[in-house]
């Protein structure tokens, strides 16, 4: 009786969305009519929606209505910024377009703003004597807290949906109220342990805030759990409010790539092989895999922000249809290179290129210089309005055109039509998704200001050459896919599952077929995989319509399969405590790798809570990025984790003449005889020539997993790098 989550568009309440939605967040006020009528009833909040942040399609629609002169009203994906806990430079404001007004107040209104402070931190998690324990008035919510805001909104929609008359009438015992018992969340496979802990805390705080906003539980009934002290299995003690309402348990047990495998395994074993795991294993196991009762499956999950590879070995106990399957994760790795990077390169080569040529044809002396000035990095004299318009160009014009081009490329293989085509500007936007005339006019004005005459962005033609698009996709992803294919082959996997929305691109299938010495039948693209009628997000032929849905459905299957599904018993307890992949820590170079000479700590085992880092130091000469990799090979791509920098500009000016500063890191103390995987500065001293002065308090080691601290290109609009 699975049902897809429905999100109601609160600024257009008759519209309900049930398809997978993007993770954009937009601050907006909600009004359901004349509030003074509910005030007269004695229930002033009868028609009040308590939150500030809209999500999904509604957030995307509201963001598209912006004209380019507003303040900060939202962002593309707060999960990218879990590490960013500093206040924003500008306060957040409410997007006023949903209600048709022109007022843009601070995003510090309503019941939700009373429960968080200016940083977005829940007040019930702060000590009573904490000076920050004040309701939000100057909303400079950290980008990390916006992930919690989004979860609160999603949880409220879920609670409202399961108790709605329309949903309950379709279920048995429709007169009984519903409650959430468990909230199952998947984790990006490559997420660092530090970010995983932040994600866990944000999810629990979101749950608590949602139930406080609904007045189902008070602050006194919330568990006194400090930030970061939650374990992966959820809270052991669930508080119960008056009336017996218990908070749902939040489960963090499965990463996205592993959950995807659960969909495949359940579909094959329970549905296609009638519960006979042994028969399925025998059919799919390679001839050179001599281990009995085992099957080795890899998942290559290509998402929007990361590409993850997970290799799991399954073995079963029992016989016939009475078996238990035991998964064991052998390998996991992730790279911050995925679908959004493909979109960015398509924008650079296929969207900005025609605009540049059209501007030169209109009389602009150098179209490339104009593009670099408009969509390059921030420069002095550009103001906030310029940055907002640039960001709106990326969201309203560049990204939709690139995605539409890629969608045409996706279907070109199935249709067999690879003929180059040319599309007009308006043809590349879906119905009702046309960009704001203000943003189009801004581009036209900038072209005219540089000498262009009779230029109109709406008249620009965009050629779509599928061969050129394929080369663009390959240039971004092929080197990474070849590296991951080497890992897949070395682990002698029997089956490779390819998931994620970008996995539908034909170039990805071609790259894998070229790099993997395997029969095509062992490479299974989950797009259009015949999964059966049990799958909630199936198409009319019972196939997986969107492969990015497999993570959510797989997590549900994984939890239910622990004794709750007939014919399919999966023991997931061995998957709950994933090990750290940080084996080598050092300084990242410009290509995202850690050279051998910049590897400061090697052969680490951060899962052993009794072992600290080696007692060795490295030189600090200026702001530097620290990351990790799990292999000794210097060419292996590394993952960014920390930024080491001066605390203030004053300290930078004072200490820079005394560099190099010798820095020694250590693991953060978690408790008696227990060490965290988090790193801290243990010691920092200036050069011998300057007297070995203590500089520990002048440096800061901050979690930062994005290269650009200012933000992702979808949030900054920076489309061209010099």
Regions found by a protein language model. Give the residues of each.
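Nucleotide/phosphate-binding catalytic cleft detector across ATP-hydrolyzing
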Residues: 72-79, 85-297, 694, 701, ...
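Gly/charged contiguous loops adjacent to phosphate- or pyrophosphate-bearing nucleotide/cofactor binding elements
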Residues: 82-87, 91-124, 135-139, 242-247, ...
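Glycine-rich phosphate-binding loops at beta-strand->alpha-helix junctions
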Residues: 182-198, 493-512
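Phosphate/oxyanion-binding active-site loops and adjacent basic polyanion-contact surfaces
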Residues: 70-74, 138-162, 192-199, 254-264, ...
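Phosphate/ATP-binding catalytic cores across multiple sugar-kinase/actin-like superfamilies
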Residues: 147-175, 261-290, 442-493, 508-511, ...
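Glycine-rich phosphate-binding loop of actin/hexokinase-like ATP-binding domains
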Residues: 1-5, 15, 258-259, 264-354, ...
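Early-domain small/polar-rich strand-loop-helix modules and first-structured segments
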Residues: 1-121, 338-358, 381, 386, ...
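Acidic, glycine/GT-rich loop-and beta-edge segments that sit at the periphery of enzyme/chaperone cores
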Residues: 275, 279, 289-291, 356-385, ...
């Amino acid at each position: 009786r699975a049902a897809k989550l429905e999100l109601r568009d609160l600024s257009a309440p008759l519209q309900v969305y049930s398809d997978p939605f993007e993770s954009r967040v937009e601050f907006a006020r909600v009004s359901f009519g004349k509030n003074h009528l509910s005030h007269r009833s004695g229930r002033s909040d009868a028609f009040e929606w308590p939150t500030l942040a809209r999500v999904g399609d509604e957030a995307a629609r509201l963001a598209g209505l912006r004209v380019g002169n507003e303040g900060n009203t939202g962002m593309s994906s707060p999960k990218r910024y879990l590490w960013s806990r500093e206040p924003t430079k500008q306060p957040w404001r409410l997007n006023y377009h949903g209600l048709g007004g022109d007022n843009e107040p601070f995003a510090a209104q309503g019941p939700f703003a009373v429960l968080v402070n200016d940083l977005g931190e829940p007040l019930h998690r702060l000590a009573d004597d904490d000076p920050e324990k004040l309701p939000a008035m100057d909303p400079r919510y950290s980008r990390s807290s916006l992930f919690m805001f989004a979860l609160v909104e999603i949880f409220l929609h879920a609670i409202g949906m399961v108790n709605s008359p329309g949903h309950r009438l379709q279920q048995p015992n429709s007169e009984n109220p519903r409650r959430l018992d468990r909230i199952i969340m998947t984790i990006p496979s490559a997420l660092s342990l530090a970010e995983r802990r932040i994600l866990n805390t944000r999810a629990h705080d979101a749950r608590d805030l949602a139930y406080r906003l609904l007045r189902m539980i008070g602050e006194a009934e919330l568990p006194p759990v400090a930030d970061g002290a939650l374990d992966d299995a959820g809270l052991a003690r669930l508080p119960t409010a008056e009336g017996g309402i218990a908070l749902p348990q939040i489960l963090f047990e499965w990463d996205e790539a592993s959950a995807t495998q659960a969909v495949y395994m359940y579909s094959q074993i329970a549905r296609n092989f009638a519960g006979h795991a042994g028969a399925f294993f025998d059919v799919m196991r390679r001839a050179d895999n001599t281990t009995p009762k085992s099957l080795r499956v890899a998942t290559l999950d290509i998402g929007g922000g990361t590409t993850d590879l997970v290799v799991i070995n399954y073995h079963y106990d029992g016989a016939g249809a009475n078996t238990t399957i035991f998964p064991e994760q052998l390998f996991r790795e992730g790279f911050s290179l995925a679908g959004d990077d493909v979109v960015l390169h398509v924008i650079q080569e296929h969207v900005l290129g025609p605009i540049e040529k059209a501007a030169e044809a209109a009389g602009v002396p150098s179209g490339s210089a104009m593009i670099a000035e408009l969509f390059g990095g921030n420069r002095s004299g550009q103001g906030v309005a310029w940055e907002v318009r640039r960001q709106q160009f990326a969201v309203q014009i560049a990204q939709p055109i690139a995605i539409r081009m890629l969608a045409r490329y996706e279907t070109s293989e199935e249709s067999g039509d690879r003929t180059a085509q040319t599309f007009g500007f308006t043809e590349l936007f879906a119905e009702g998704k046309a960009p704001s005339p203000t943003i189009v006019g801004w581009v036209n004005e900038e072209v005219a200001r540089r000498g262009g005459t009779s230029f109109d962005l709406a008249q620009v033609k965009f050629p779509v050459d599928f061969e050129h698009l394929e080369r663009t996709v390959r240039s971004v992803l092929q080197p990474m896919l070849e590296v991951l294919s080497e890992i897949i082959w070395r682990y002698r996997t029997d089956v490779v599952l390819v998931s994620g929305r970008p996995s539908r691109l034909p170039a990805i299938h071609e790259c894998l077929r070229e790099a993997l010495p395997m029969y095509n039948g062992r490479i299974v693209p989950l797009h259009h995989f015949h999964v059966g009628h049990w799958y909630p997000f199936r198409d009319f032929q019972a196939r997986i319509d969107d492969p990015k849905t497999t993570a959510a459905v797989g997590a549900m299957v994984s939890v239910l399969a622990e004794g709750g599904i007939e014919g399919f018993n999966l023991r997931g307890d061995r998957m709950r405590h994933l090990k750290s992949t940080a084996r080598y820590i050092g300084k990242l170079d410009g290509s995202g790798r850690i050279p051998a000479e910049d590897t400061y700590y090697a052969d680490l085992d951060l899962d052993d809570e009794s072992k600290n880092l080696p007692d060795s130091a490295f030189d600090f000469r200026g702001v530097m990025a620290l990351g990790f990799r799990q292999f000794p090979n210097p060419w292996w791509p590394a993952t960014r984790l920390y930024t080491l920098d001066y605390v203030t500009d004053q300290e930078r000016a004072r200490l820079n003449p005394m560099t190099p500063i010798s820095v020694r890191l250590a693991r953060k103390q978690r408790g008696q005889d227990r060490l965290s995987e988090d790193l801290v500065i243990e010691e920092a001293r200036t050069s011998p020539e300057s007297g070995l002065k203590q500089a520990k308090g002048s440096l800061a080691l901050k979690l930062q997993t994005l290269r650009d601290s200012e933000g992702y290109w979808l949030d900054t609009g920076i489309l061209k790098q010099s």
